[in-house]
């Protein structure tokens, strides 16, 4: 103390708060100066002082002390603004998901960090004695980040997988969390808790394995005499200065170090602070130091190779168990660090990049040839400079030059005006951080249903040639064209065919899919329409008036349009030459036995129609009977239309039936029950007897109706009929008795002896004379059918337009399928169709085209962009195209096909549509969609996509378009005309009409569908629409039909919206069909912004776009699925592979350490260390020839892999701020890398191939045999290394006990009990510390040591004895740098 008092005069007085780090420094200085005991004494006094002060001044903490940082509000607002812009970019498809995630995390992380930095100055200014503030920097409990969560914002959390949740917690704990934030923070907290539990066991196991590997390593010698070392150079910029100092302090030099001619340090001298500082200042040559790697022995280590003991700053003592210390020092931080869970989610590439900012305002100039455009990791455009780039900034009076280093990103364009402090470039983080990057896969899922398209070529990954994994060669968009698919496992669905229309409430099997996609503006309309248009369905006879008709169109093409019924399940079947479009009526849905009716379009087998042949027929379910009976036409004559028998395939029953054409409206059906029985069957009723309902007739038959039984025996079978009705025994006077088989109309009096009454319905009187008895009259009920024109195909196929359109006529004819009086037999339960409504094709005999006798018909499948559609096409064979010139439209002149050729030669498919009122009402009430099947290659139906109509908007209107005056008024009221939000193409809802250019009116009163405000104009019919449609095939050729025969080719419902623009103005962009347009791209000059989508229709003055969602993908991303494939919500679209920094926290770090130590593959891309090693082995052996090659190859490989392993492990720990001395890691790595694998049988047969032996042993054996042993280096994981030691007892006590012991017994292994564990197991003295001397006998040592060393050792021993009592003297003489025992200096003296 006196000395201190004396020196106090010239000491500097530090008036400064001492925090944790300052305290650490102070203590280390004290230890350096005064040694351990003295220091502990001083610290004791400091502790006492501290407690006295703390007792005097207590701190209380109240909730008012938690002051929120004032700048938080606008910081958070700013961050939200940025995320909003980012979200928009992502929505437009400018940024892909990974970039969005990265950027949003960086935005929030920066905000959170900024708040954290604000916290301290804020407290210092407003309330320096705030207890929270004092606490957070005391270094005791609580650190800045915890306080930051109390008063700043909690920031980002990670989910259970360790991925970031990109929704930050904006509140702090003082303000309180919202529900969402609370749940997210529970994720983070739970992850912390779970990780702590899980990782503790992991870390414990890691420690156990590490100790297992190195437990036998003890310091047994002072010097192994190696000449090798590892060179460390301070000049090399790779290693920061502090790491450099850490590496050197406590090591022993392997070589003298010269500064010019002067030697500033000698070999075997240990390095202290002073020496290190000298090295740094002099920037001397690379310094060669001794490490455990260079130690000559395998099973122990010498003092000089180990260096100073970290505990007391002296050279390590003999007999110290350095192996166990090393294992623990690596394993222990693992258990501690599990508690540090960092919430950065590993997105940063080793810290945020550095920025270069502009020194002043001005214009920026640089040489554009030296940079090339690229994307930053946030998806922003930038320029990458490959060499140094000089940027000049010209402000008003001065030029600034800024130098931008290579590999940086320039964020501004040439000649751009920049403001002072604006970020102009981003310097890529140093190369050193690249090592702990990790490749991570990120899947992007589709958030809507639809079809997939992509706008660029893709490569098939070679291993998935036939799969659906594609690689993107360049940055491009993937598009999901919206539409709702419907999944069903029912086979039933295969009868839905492409382009069928259906209600959104359609029944599929027993399951009901309901979609209310377009309910938005419908409610209003439902009210308006429900009063006028209620269709009464009390009679339960379905009203077919709202069916679409079959259309005949340009060049005699008949394109069928599917039929939609309000509650119909619509199925269309395509057979080889026949379409059936069935309908279900309500009646049938309840009573499912009835087969469904349908319109069948049928083509003759040879494909040729003669005149008057039947094109399509419709079996009306009302003319269908289940029971057998007789048809009567009364007195009306009929004639058979088709003379030859016509083969009908109907419901699988082939029957020859002539067709009889009806002349009248009435026909009668007399029901009877008929059973046809085999001749051998026993009948339980007599002929002419009367039975009741459900009487037993034969063993397994019961009667369905009651009545008179007639039995007729034919050749091989019995026909049994039951006639229902009344039986009269007429008197003589009754006239009726003379008739038999007569139909009596209602109203005729019927007299009889007892009573007389009027007949209400038609009846059929039949006279029956049984044998031996008087005859009687059977009065049978009759079912009357009348055929009205109201409910037949006339509504389906109005003849006007057909006739007007080029001479083709479709006549509608009703046929009765059975002759007059013919008995009709129903087979089991099938129904019998009595009347068939047919559509007869005919054409006028024109003078010019009189030669035209036959028409060819075929079903056409058109495939556009992978979708298949069916059309029925009828061509008159010799018809010239005569009408093209007549009806040309001026608007058509600009719309030729792309190559400029005239479009008249392209065969168009035109269509005309007409609607009835029920159709309108129903299309307004009900959301509908169209079935749109996607076929796979074998044309089996795979899935349906139901495209339904939603979010339609029509943009415009523009100037110079002539409108009706009515429409003009409505435009004034409402510039955006809502066309009905569930717009679809025709057939599903109202036509989309260019109201001022209608070419073809069928209707009497024109109505305006486009504006539902003008309801008074709604009459029962309305205008037919024409569209300019273009067809695109796979090669992108455009079939552009003549505008005067405008065609609808996509009768399916999409998400559409309209964009009107006037082609009179020049358009800024030329729109091609099928083109994809991103949102916010302006097409016309003053046009509104678009939604994103694909152009599916280009009109003279507007385009229709099908909504689509773009997803951006970068090169190397994997696309799942095929082009045009249906995707469902939540399906994987793309997989990105991106890099994120490894070890965001120790939870990610520990597994990395383990991976390195177990020598597993670390990242998916870079080669494993093992492979690298093999490469080295081969090359060097080839260069140097065999005997030396193996040795040197092995040595070099081992050296290289060792250093890289040490660096990798250090990186993980350093990223956590954990300092572990390199030598601990080196000891363990040395054990992993010191084995070689014998690769082939030498002549000597000393080792068997595949045996693992130590490298030194292999060298010695090679020297002894004077023959090359072939071996190669292997990297063992720590588990394998602990199972390949010299002691089988230690191996057996670790793992696989039975196997290890059995093998050892077979080989006759000997355990020399050199390690700790073997001795512990067997209860011997541990050869460490005090038990160490007993192991090494001097005699044993002398046997295997060469002569000179013996002499040297003797000399050492003598000197030690002489100098022992002078030790203290020496100690004080030596400079502060060397805390050495004299022995060492003498050794140094001897060696030099």
Curated annotation (Swiss-Prot):
- Predominantly, its location class is plastid
- Could you give the cofactor binding note from the entry? Binds 1 Zn(2+) ion per subunit.
Does the keyword Chloroplast feature in the UniProt annotation? yes
Could you provide one GO biological process annotation from this protein's UniProt record?
DNA-templated transcription
Q: Tell me its cofactors.
A: Zn(2+)
Q: Where does Zn(2+) bind?
A: 224, 295, 302, 305
- Specify one Pfam family: RNA_pol_Rpb1_5
Q: Where in the cell is it found?
A: Plastid, Chloroplast
Sequence similarity: Belongs to the RNA polymerase beta' chain family. RpoC2 subfamily.
Q: Which NCBIfam families match?
A: rpoC2_cyan
User: Under which name does UniProt file this protein?
Assistant: DNA-directed RNA polymerase subunit beta''
Please report the organism this UniProt entry assigns to the protein: Nicotiana tomentosiformis (Tobacco)
